[in-house]
């Protein structure tokens, strides 16, 4: 019985740990390597203080090492001397980081990113998983005999370099840019009724008795007083580079991914609201540069086409905002943001709430 235990248990533990690390590495590249890794950088590394220059290198090397450890745990070269201790150390670092996140946020919400977007896991769940893995590795360390270790370091280096290089080939680092692509559909509708208040001009008696200069000075003052009570003062939203007229009037700004089912649902709900409301705020869309070939299908499912821009993945996440997720829907009035729906949980887009919001006068709105 003891012989069976000594022969099968170490291999069982090694297979489990290998599976854990390989799945973790692959999950961070799902559904497409560049998109998934860029998302991992923005959501997990940027909050830790990594710069836009360091994060792409660190993410690919880290995932490459994870994949390498998943493979190396199955072979015998420097297994007890090097591979197991490094694996334990890496897991301990993860536990330390996740414990800090848990201390700050409670740990019961959000996705720790251990398995990318494929298998969402809260920080507390990830801590438990990693502690169990550490105990298994410590047990494995004492189960294995020192004489079982082989000393071909070239195998270890070769596998590690191969996995890291493969990450850079699968998801090449792109030059950081904030440029955007102009959409082929740029059918921005222009209102026939412009936002101008024209002072009524009476007959000759007014023209002859009122000086022109006094009219020029008096009328704008009254107009400004009326506008100040009926709509907010203009501010810069930060999106004028994408949509030049976004800071004038009421707008619905959306952050969508063409292949995202939740984004399509939100867009469809917006279309239904717009069809029922002639004064609905103009809909503008910022698309992530991921699966852009699906944009025609996106609009077909939505039931309408809207002006849009396409921006690269990392600039898209930056524009969406730290801690925010798709779909994102903003209610903007004269450049002021009054509501920002995002994600698919508590703050997700709510068409009933949005309909009530856009019907409110300026005096009832809170930023």
From Swiss-Prot:
Matching SUPFAM superfamilies: Thioredoxin-like
GO CC terms of this entry: membrane
Main location per the UniProt record: membrane
Protein location: Membrane
Record-annotated membrane-spanning stretches: 15-35, 53-73, 83-103, 124-144, 153-173
Keyword Cytoplasm: no
Official protein name in the record: Protein TlpB
Species this protein is from: Flavobacterium psychrophilum
